[in-house]
């Protein structure tokens, strides 16, 4: 095995295996915990109608953004 092969083997395979694993309470996990309540909310069918009504009213008030389908 060449020297380059040994270096690649050590750095690409052995070093990641020996690295400490991250703990569960990392700062990167916090936004997912904060958004758990937002993901848990359920939009009822009437809610979609209300959102569509508000959206169309907004488009009618802003004629430059209005796209007629």
UniProtKB/Swiss-Prot annotation:
Gene Ontology terms, MF aspect: ion channel inhibitor activity; potassium channel regulator activity; toxin activity
Main location group: secreted
This protein's record includes keyword Signal: yes
InterPro entries cross-referenced by the UniProt entry: Conotoxin
An annotated GO cellular component: extracellular region
Endpoints of the signal sequence: 1-20
Tissue expression from the record: Expressed by the venom duct.
Subcellular location per the Swiss-Prot or TrEMBL entry: Secreted
Keyword set, alphabetical order: Ion channel impairing toxin, Neurotoxin, Potassium channel impairing toxin, Secreted, Signal, Toxin, Voltage-gated potassium channel impairing toxin
Any Pfam family: Conotoxin
Stretches of the chain forming a coiled coil according to its record: none
Positions of the pro-segment in this chain: 21-69
Note: The mature peptide does not contain cysteine residues.
Function noted in UniProt: Tyrosine-rich conopeptide that specifically targets voltage-gated potassium channel Kv1.6/KCNA6 (IC(50) is 8.8 uM) that is expressed in Xenopus oocytes. In vivo, causes seizures (at 5 nmol) and death (20 nmol) when intracranially injected into mice, and causes paralysis (at 10 pmol) to C.elegans.
Family according to the record: Belongs to the conotoxin M superfamily. Conopeptide Y family.
Protein name listed in UniProt: Conopeptide Y-Fe1
Record lineage: Eukaryota, Metazoa, Spiralia, Lophotrochozoa, Mollusca
């Amino acid at each position: 095995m060449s020297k380059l092969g040994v270096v690649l083997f050590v750095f690409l395979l052995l070093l990641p295996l020996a690295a400490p694993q991250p703990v569960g309470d990392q700062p990167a996990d916090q936004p997912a915990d904060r958004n758990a309540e937002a993901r848990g909310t359920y939009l009822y069918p009437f809610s979609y109608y209300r959102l569509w009504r508000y959206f169309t009213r907004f488009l009618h008030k802003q004629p430059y953004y209005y796209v007629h389908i």
